[in-house]
């Protein structure tokens, strides 16, 4: 770098600001420290905020698997910043990331569509990336470095400096970004006086009642419910209790090691839930060799890891004295200093075969011989380790100190040459030179004519038919999705990607989307839900930006009871609900709009029908649902604030009594995937009959199950007033709407459950031929009354891209 040339600044996006995470140290902190010696500056961050791109010349995302990473990569490409993704695990191995919030492979594939280059620590992993990702994507190999005490301290200091800067964030910024403040301002804008008073009273109760409970010495009625295990990241679900310092030297089983025992050291992650054998289990694979060595020599097996229970189950029963030490970087160094031989077994499955030589190099540089399974990463060290038979290798080192000395002498020079800080800096400089000199170009950005915006889980079923129509007609179409949607409903990432349309994930702020520049090709933008309400701010901000850019904008009626169109209450007063989209595509005749809908809104409305597919793919129900028995679905609404306690009690009591009265029928209560009133907000006690199941979306067995996917399994549907009534009616199912004391003329002629007896009457009618047919006929009549027949998706696409169409989608 010349004296006049501006120093490079690299932004390192990490999974967390935690120097204890191996990938953070080896793949980011050690490289940035090496590059700093070469005049390259760096900043590290774990946030996906676009602000982090300011002032950097390249973005390196290090083994991070979130929707924010996709959004940040897109934003960087748009700004002309090269995106390099550094990956040290084979995320495409079977069951990798099992239990993770979002499938890592899905995230990596999306970033691979636009990344400038990928970097891996081994050739094996590089080949996997070339096979799995887009053709022509450059993949480079930068090996793991060698961890030393001073290097680890410098890495920890780098993280601490970053955290300290975050702690100095001004108080005014924290107040400005407060979710409670934002919700209150929204309520003032859209609620009635009665609605505002009710919400404030509820807020005050939830804040003050726990305080009162503590003063009175009783349990709080609004104590927060513990997070379900299925919602916790895998690392939290499968984490052993750390050993106390006094426990670190315990020999669990077998005869205690003698004071003069030679120490055989293994250290690393205990394992994972993905396919293959990985972690401590690798020692068990070499059980015969270890036990034979223990019979012939005075040895101790020392395991430094992060799962004491797994050690007790797998390692302690082996016929060799053994000791468990809870993992930390400092304890690894302590045990390494005392070791005689380091063991690096490898199962050589699809995941493990791609691992680097970092443990082997660390041991050799510390002056300890290594016995290892031969893997491609260890080929350069083949003449200074024992690779192969573990019994022979361990025996040689225990009996031949000259061999140990010779191997260590070769290894230290070799490791410094291959994995030292100078080597790491050189490898990274080559990558940075390539991506910055335009030898490599970022993937061509998509040039769509139509942009579809997805923000909530229910948006997916609207978008897929629209994508299909656009693609059939040769119209370039793209999907812009929110990071919050993918974080909250991870399966939506794969569902949208499967539509075949290019997917862009957008970052968000408290005020909405971080809207990128619209490509010149864009002629129209369609949101599924666009109002001035908080849940729609992401879509609404994109609509506003498109309007300013002179692009045609549209939005959809997204529910049968749609705020601002067909529904009003004290929190969502219809006169205060506004739509910024120029066109609003509604399902039925305009006479079905709410009588108080504003004239401004009415003039934007165009009747097209419902674009959601009536027939949907049949989902697989969990094994907990008995086979061979009829199933009835009971659906809760997204907006449970609309109902009083009397209605809620009527709904829950009725469902429970119904299940007791019909023991041969399985009833599945399906909470709304976005609302989840019964599973996350209900404060009462639930005592349910065995044949009444709750399809909790937070549980792995129910995750991703939508109402549409359930319908093909059902004999009938009972629902609170909601779109599910229409969805079920469209596929010809008998439907009952739980009315209680609500006036629901808009659901005529569907069956209304207004009394306790009506619950049982409806269920009995489901299995009586004559009465069932009457219910099916009522469903058909309901659909005919509220939905315009025909291809709604085609009409919407035509309206958006052809301004010469009249209100019915026909050429003027």
Say what each PLM segment does.
Residues 274-281, 329, 340-365, 372-381:
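Nucleotide-sugar-dependent
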Residues 319-329, 335, 506, 690-703:
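Active-site donor-binding acidic/aromatic loop of nucleotide-activated sugar
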Residues 401-437, 773-799:
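A charged, aromatic-enriched C-terminal amphipathic alpha-helix characteristic of glycosyltransferases
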Residues 11-38, 147-316, 320-337, 459-463, ...:
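Conserved catalytic-core segment of nucleotide-activated headgroup transferases in glycan assembly
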Residues 112-139, 146-159, 167-172, 221-243, ...:
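A short, active-site helix/loop in glycosyltransferases that binds the activated sugar's phosphate group
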Residues 341, 348-368, 596, 702-748:
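A donor-sugar binding/catalytic signature common to diverse glycosyltransferases
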Residues 91-94, 99-107, 451-615:
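Active-site and donor-binding regions of nucleotide-sugar-utilizing enzymes
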Residues 154-155, 386-406, 412, 754-774:
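C-terminal "capping" alpha-helix adjacent to the active site of nucleotide-linked donor transferases
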